Amino acid sequence: MDFSCEKREKLKNGASMISFCAPHLHTVAFSVVLPFVPEYTPGVYHLVEHLFFERAGERRADEINAEMTSRGSEIDGYTSVSYMCFHFVCRQEVFRPQLRLLHSMLTQREYTEEDLQKVLPVIRNEIFESDFYDGRAGDVLYDLWFDSRYSGSVLGDSGILENVADEEIASARESLFTKDMCLFVAGNFQEEDVREIYDTFGEIPLKEREIPPARKEKRITRPLNRVGRGRELQVLVTYHVERADYELKMAAHWLRSALFDGLDAAAFRYFDGKGFQFYSIDGNYNIRGDELIFSYLVHIEKGDKKYFLPLVDGFERAAERTNFVSLVRPYLYENLVFLFDNPERLCAHYVDAWQDMSAPVTLQEEAEFCGSFTDEQLAANWVRIARSLRRVFLIGR
């Protein structure tokens, strides 16, 4: 694989940027990641995200939307529990004006009560809509973090948000702009486009990010936990590693893929052999700093609980014998070249890698590190996960 078109650099304001130039393509993708420690009222950062779409200098929401439409490119944004991300993909000839629009949105400082009253009903409806879905497994995973700042709701409570002080909203907004800001650009961009990034995002005043120590919390350590009642069960098996190192963080994606992705994955083969023919097994992992939570979720009837739970130990042992490399390498290593031709996916991949490592990671770094994985090495990392704090949740319906 040729990574000569990939570049990592520091902007003069301290922000990090990774770029991947592909002059044979017709599109350019751009993403900006704004990390934060969720110290404020739950939902405030999500509120700030909505406000960013209300004003951009003299332009109001209708004019912002009209500009995006005229270029055939929509700026999207989302808020996670620990960062905010904005991204877009467009034709090369409209990249610079679209970049300037996003920069103007994010550097807007003044908002009116009218702006706030426009976004609150949208947020209220978003919360209302999310309540229609059974998100209890996700709620359980949120609650597992030992630092409770990361277990708060991203959307928040609309009634509480209606009364949040303007000063708190402004303070949360300012806390986004630190030297941990990361920019990712990929595709057919020119030198003039890079200079535009320097002249816009490279000129935003950034401060050092203060990361307060984790709060000491009461920890849920019971091996078996029940949530709700009913004859249908979601079984959520979780593993919690407190001091995950660089290798384990890099290996987590490979382990999840080998164990749970596709019908030839280890979990499907094991549980099928034990009489459980699952349509899907939802394997997942999340990383916050040095905490890693690895999990999988299956659906069973309540009467099958006594047969399934003893298999959790058996799966841990069977998974050690997985042919990890043959299952995963074609997808996660050899298929990295697919990203060369898809700027939007490449920028999303950079964001995912940043989320896992809490730092920007180039494709070359990922390929060089993960390309040397062996079955024995990946099995050892799985053993480390399997021997960490395990908690099983029976979520009834």
What do the PLM-derived regions correspond to, one by one?
Residues 1-64, 170-270, 390-397:
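His/Glu-rich zincin catalytic helix
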Residues 57, 63-210, 241-243, 251, ...:
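Charge-rich, well-structured scaffold segments of protease-associated domains
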